[in-house]
Amino acid sequence: MTTTYLPKLNVPGPPLNPILGRLPMILRFAKDSIGYARPLFETYGFVVSMTAEGGTNIYSPLAKCPGTVFTCGAENVRKVTSQHEIYYKYPLTGNMFRKRNDSPRTEPLKHFGVGLFGVNSGTHRQHRQLLMPAFHKQRIDSYRSDMVAITQSVLEQLTIDKPVDIAQVMRLLTLRIATKTLFGSDIGEEGAKSGQILQEVSAMNGNLAIAFLPFDIPGLPYHRLLNLFAQLDDEMRALIRRKQANNTDDGDVLSMLIRAQDAETGLRLSEDELLGHTGVIFAAGHETSANALTWTLFLLSQHPLWAQDVVDELQSVLKGEAPTIEQLQKLPLLERVIKESMRLLTPVPWNGRVTSQATELGGYELPKGTEVFVSIYQTHHLAEIYPEPEKFNPQRWETFEPTMFEYNPFSAGSRVCIGAGFAMMEIKIVLSMLLQKYRLQYIPNQTIDRFGLIVMAPKNGIKMIVRKQDYNFTQGVGGVKGNIREMVELIG
């Protein structure tokens, strides 16, 4: 029998636990990836391994991995996000599907979560070209009326002077928008079940039991996950076939993807590919936007002067109405606030890759198969790029024009998020309508901790009292506990 040895990962990092080995490091990273990695960057520099001994594998679908490397800084971001033939993307489903788990029950995992995140080289270029028409500006602009109607519906359900978990409200709102624009169905309508199942799948992200106990046994989260993917597979295939039979553009993203065709080759997306792309688009358009909105509303609740200036701008331009497409371009302060929020509290803090061949990064040799995590969050908090990096200062964006490798909440290079324009329009519409109508007052003495690996969300939500927009922005400032204070300067 021939024994295969993994190549040695010679990148600096902390030593193994003498008793438990790599396990404590993996658990700490899974519990709080930002809190785990930040001191490593401070100690070892911009390229650091999870452990100097290598052999870790956090998310890669590869059964064998030389180790996990974290990196940050504009030059390293440029290398990893630009050298596509060296740094491959892998599916959103990550290590939930590996060859050792191959079975009919795991078959749907091959399709969902793949999309543009899980294809590389020529296939990625070809698929991105097919998807682009669904995200051209004219097409995105056509979703404005649905976004406004759904936002208005959700806002009308809020009760004045009553507390709400604003994170939960934003998840519901973006779920409805994603379901309507992607599938053509709002919650409660035919076809919306796919969106509801996808939300439950997203909620299982970060469940350690799935990674450590990938066994299809009733009672285990992995078993529940496979059940959800089986349901989703059935629902989505039925929806795709109904739309194919109708052979019409219903105005939603899925309808357009079904009809997409390469002008030169006549190539269309297969049913499996449609499943993969819709899963990725839904996740990106739902969880990411929900967290960006939640963090922005929290930051405004703790920075009353900026909150007042933003509401003044909104009232001056919109006069209490929902924004038109043209008016969205006339809200410069709102855009700066969103940019600063997504810099400080990056909704997607990591960008994962795996090396397809041996390569060099930051002066270190990385073997083939090395898992590489680019820290978007850490790059956004480097003082050499952003003076006073923990300070919420939208004014910095009046003159500062970073490169795409210094500021990349939507990734960078040719793999920049295809739905970035959609997300920014959605966030602007929701904030402009909400802030004109309500003032959200933070309830003091909550513990606000970050949570998540793919996306960063408040672990226990954020409770706020819904007030009429009365301009009393100083109410509810202060009394914030938790590791949020490591990420942003706060009063009190």
Region locations from a protein language model:
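Cytochrome P450 heme-thiolate monooxygenase catalytic core
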Residues: 2-8, 89-104, 108, 119, ...
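Cytochrome P450 proximal C-terminal region
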Residues: 11-14, 41-42, 151, 196-201, ...
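Conserved cytochrome P450 K-helix E-x-x-R motif and the immediately C-terminal K′/meander segment
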Residues: 24-48, 234, 238, 321-362, ...
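Cytochrome P450 catalytic-core helices
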Residues: 288-307, 311-313, 421-436
